[in-house]
């Protein structure tokens, strides 16, 4: 998106649903991502055209719901999980961001409350994958253009991010050959076959 927006980082890109979906499609189909093990797509909150378009374009995708402990954030995240399931996507789990922080003196600071991630996970029936503490190192790493897990691996958030990566690799995203054998994969391939047959019939 930076290439599209140009050098003016404060300029708004005012696109409607069709243009957004076309842009997402170009990112997925035309960008040379290289030899990837996983492609993580950070989506905006809510249930917008982008989420619905991705659900259609990536039918064998797992969804990870991110929330803060705040009640309002949980409600938005719960709607995102519901939309994912209505799109026949698997909700793999919940990540709590901006969670409680353990101070050097051992006290705990919970700027946005506690337990919200676990409450959301329980309410939608999925595991809590991680609770990422509110940590200055995350901001410093982001401003430096380097992930906190690499720039500050021993920081509280850096440790949790590395543990979360292990969880995702081991438990969340199955190898592609397993995903293709799942019911969701079978339905996706069947849908592709039907669409191909429909297009061939229209050209005859």
Segments predicted by a language model, with ranges:
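Short coil/turn segments at secondary-structure junctions
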Residues: 8-11, 64, 148, 152
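Flexible phosphate-sensing "switch/lid" loops adjacent to ATP/NTP-binding sites
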Residues: 1-40, 45-58, 78, 160-191, ...
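The feature captures the short pre-catalytic strand/loop hairpin that immediately precedes
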Residues: 1-3, 7, 139-146
């Amino acid at each position: 998106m930076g290439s599209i927006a140009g050098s003016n980082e404060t300029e708004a890109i005012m696109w409607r649903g069709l243009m957004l979906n076309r842009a997402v499609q170009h990112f997925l189909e035309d960008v040379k991502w290289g030899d990837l093990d996983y492609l993580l797509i950070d989506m905006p909150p809510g249930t917008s055209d982008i989420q619905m378009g991705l659900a259609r374009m990536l039918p064998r995708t797992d969804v990870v719901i991110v929330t803060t402990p705040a009640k309002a954030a949980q409600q938005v995240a719960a709607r995102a999980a519901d939309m994912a399931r209505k799109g026949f996507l698997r909700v793999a789990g919940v990540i709590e961001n901006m969670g409680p922080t353990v101070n050097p003196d051992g006290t705990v600071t919970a700027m946005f409350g506690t337990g919200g991630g676990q409450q959301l996970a329980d309410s939608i029936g999925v595991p809590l994958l991680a609770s990422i503490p509110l940590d200055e190192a995350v901001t410093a790493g982001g401003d430096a253009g380097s992930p906190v897990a690499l720039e500050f691996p021993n920081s509280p958030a850096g440790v949790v991010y590395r543990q979360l990566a292990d969880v995702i690799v081991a438990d969340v995203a199955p190898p592609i050959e397993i995903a293709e054998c799942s019911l969701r994969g079978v339905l996706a391939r069947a849908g592709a076959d039907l669409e191909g047959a429909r297009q061939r019939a229209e050209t005859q």
